[in-house]
């Protein structure tokens, strides 16, 4: 059994996607970030970076003591290795999956903490800041659009943890469901993200 420390954000959705698609048993442990639950000592013992998601796997492969993990990319990789699912087994395919997983982990802060914050949540709307992060977000959407023009999924022919990491951020954005920014970012122009 896996305990999933979760709140319904794009990063939280990544891990629930894996758990649901793999059919793994888990218990949802809400971490209400609006009320500051991420700063409580019990949660910090599992996720010292005070960010969710985090998991505790009470039945790790090979048995042994429970394993606690934080950071969505690390969790996805752990679950893929534990189950043998949603990651290529050959070296080249695995490298491709990890490349796109790490691309998302490095790029999403510009989308969420940058564009999303200043466009949707900042108390003062600063045009320069919004435009700067919008330009970077559109560059990232273009990277994905070009990749999906040549590949069924971001890491090749198969659905992987890279897709699970990317969709909650970029898929929702491309559908106009994140930050209400679809028209502003002209997401309809990224045809391969619309499929």
Please provide the spans of the model-predicted regions.
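Amphipathic alpha-helical core segments of compact helical bundles
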Residues: 80, 102, 149, 166-174
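GST superfamily/GST-like fold recognition
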Residues: 107, 111-116, 154-191
């Amino acid at each position: 059994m896996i305990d999933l420390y979760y709140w319904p954000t794009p990063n939280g959705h990544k891990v629930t996607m894996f758990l649901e698609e793999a059919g793994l048993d888990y218990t949802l442990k809400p971490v209400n970030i609006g009320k500051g639950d991420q700063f409580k000592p019990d949660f910090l013992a599992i996720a010292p970076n005070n960010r969710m998601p985090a998991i505790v796997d009470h039945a790790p492969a090979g048995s042994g003591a429970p394993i606690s993990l934080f950071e969505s990319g690390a969790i996805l990789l752990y679950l893929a290795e534990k189950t043998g699912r949603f990651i290529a087994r050959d070296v080249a395919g695995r490298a491709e999956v990890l490349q796109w997983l790490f691309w998302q982990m490095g790029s999403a802060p510009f989308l969420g903490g940058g564009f999303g914050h200043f466009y949707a949540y900042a108390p003062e709307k600063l045009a320069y800041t919004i435009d700067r992060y919008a330009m970077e977000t559109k560059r990232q959407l273009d990277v994905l659009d070009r990749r999906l023009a040549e590949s069924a999924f971001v890491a090749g022919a198969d659905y992987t943890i890279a897709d699970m990491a990317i969709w909650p951020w970029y898929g929702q954005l491309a559908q106009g469901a994140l930050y209400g920014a679809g028209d502003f970012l002209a997401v309809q122009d990224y045809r391969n993200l619309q499929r």
